Amino acid sequence: METPRPVVSRRPFCCTLKCFVKFLRLVVTVTSMIFFIVGQAPEPYIVITGFEVTVIFCFLVLYTCGLDKIMRSFFWPLLDVINSMVTALCMLIVSVLALIPETSTKTILGGVFGFLTVTCTIADCALMCQKLRFRPRQPYQKKSTNDIDDRE
């Protein structure tokens, strides 16, 4: 008689560290955008930051609703890592440009929060890179023949 297999339940995305980092990234980017808007920063700063907010929100919805498991035509972790790298580069440039000239205090705060966005983006990219590893984190352990027979 077969023994029933235990059902492996995964934690929902909203209860993971990746969700926390993405949500923190979203909040910091929105804060940076608000400071750019209130400080009347140049339009490219606001547009780039707003675009990043939109993309982060879309990835949050994608992972929270489980659409990445339904739409298998894309390799979502790779797209997320590429997005994180582009975001880090763009926000780093915007933040440096916001801090260089003599600008208002609110624009400077937008630049500082932009640097925090870059930090959160790098952390998010590091977490997503773990999914892209081809080799497992633990060393490979050869299973005995009894373990193989139990799974069948």
Curated annotation (Swiss-Prot):
Indicate the segments forming the MARVEL domain, all copies: 13-133
Function according to Swiss-Prot or TrEMBL: May play an important role in inflammation and regeneration of skeletal muscle. Essential for embryonic development.
Which GO biological process entries does UniProt record here?
A: lymphocyte chemotaxis; macrophage chemotaxis; neutrophil chemotaxis; secretion by cell
Which chain regions cross the lipid bilayer?
Answer: 19-39, 46-66, 81-101, 108-128
The alphabetized UniProt keywords are: Chemotaxis, Cytokine, Membrane, Transmembrane, Transmembrane helix
- List the subcellular locations: Membrane
Membership in a protein family = Belongs to the chemokine-like factor family.
Q: Which PANTHER family match?
A: CHEMOKINE-LIKE FACTOR (PTHR22776:SF45), MARVEL-CONTAINING POTENTIAL LIPID RAFT-ASSOCIATED PROTEIN (PTHR22776)
Out of the domains of life, which is the source? Eukaryota
Q: Does the keyword ATP-binding apply?
A: no
A GO molecular-function descriptor: chemokine activity
According to UniProt, the tissues expressing it are described as: Ubiquitous.
In terms of InterPro entries, this protein maps to: Marvel (IPR008253), MARVEL-CKLF_proteins (IPR050578)
Q: Does the keyword Transferase apply?
A: no
Tell me what topology the record assigns in the membrane. Multi-pass membrane protein
Subcellular location, principal = membrane
Q: Spell out the GO cellular component terms annotated for this protein, sorted alphabetically and separated by semicolons.
A: extracellular space; membrane
User: Could you identify this protein by its name?
Assistant: Chemokine-like factor
**UniProt organism field:** Mus musculus
Query: Any idea what a deletion of this gene does?
Result: Mice exhibit embryonic lethality.
